[in-house]
């Protein structure tokens, strides 16, 4: 890693490529059959983050996307960011699938500074969800929003697809 110290704040995107099912519209690098690699992948991400941390003064935003980040163990995911120089006002986002939102995971996220959830809703219309290859239903979305709000997260993004 270069010895250049980055003086300005900047953002980090972490791609978590694991999914329970590949959505029909998805063109991202994702895996549905490699759960055995989750722990090694997250450990490699943690090692890379530690190596880069020596050049980072302040991280202004973190976005964990995928894939389905909330499909992997929340504590292992959050361990990647322990000790990194997050700015006190950093926006820290985890992308979530409505089928996998749990109070326990949200508690871990909040304890590690997550203050924004991006919920992969795509649609609230059952036949549209089916045509997209999505497994969740509108009730899962309502339940997920309630869990997210109860965890104290006020900044919530709902991803929607139109067209």
Predicted ranges, named:
Residues 9-11, 23, 91:
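Structural motif
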């Amino acid at each position: 890693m270069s010895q250049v110290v980055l003086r300005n704040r900047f953002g980090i995107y972490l791609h978590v490529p694991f999914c329970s099912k590949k959505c029909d519209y998805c063109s991202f690098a994702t895996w549905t059959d490699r759960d055995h690699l989750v722990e090694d992948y997250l450990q490699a991400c943690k090692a890379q983050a530690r190596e880069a941390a020596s050049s980072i003064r302040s991280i202004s935003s973190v976005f964990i996307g995928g894939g389905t980040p909330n499909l992997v163990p929340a504590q292992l995911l959050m361990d990647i960011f322990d000790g990194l120089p997050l700015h006190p006002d950093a926006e820290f986002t985890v992308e979530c699938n409505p089928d996998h939102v749990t109070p326990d995971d949200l508690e871990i996220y909040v304890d590690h500074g997550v203050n924004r959830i991006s919920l992969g809703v795509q649609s609230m219309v059952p036949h549209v969800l089916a045509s997209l290859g999505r497994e969740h239903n509108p009730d899962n979305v309502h339940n997920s929003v309630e869990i997210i709000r109860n965890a104290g997260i006020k900044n919530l993004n709902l991803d929607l697809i139109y067209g």
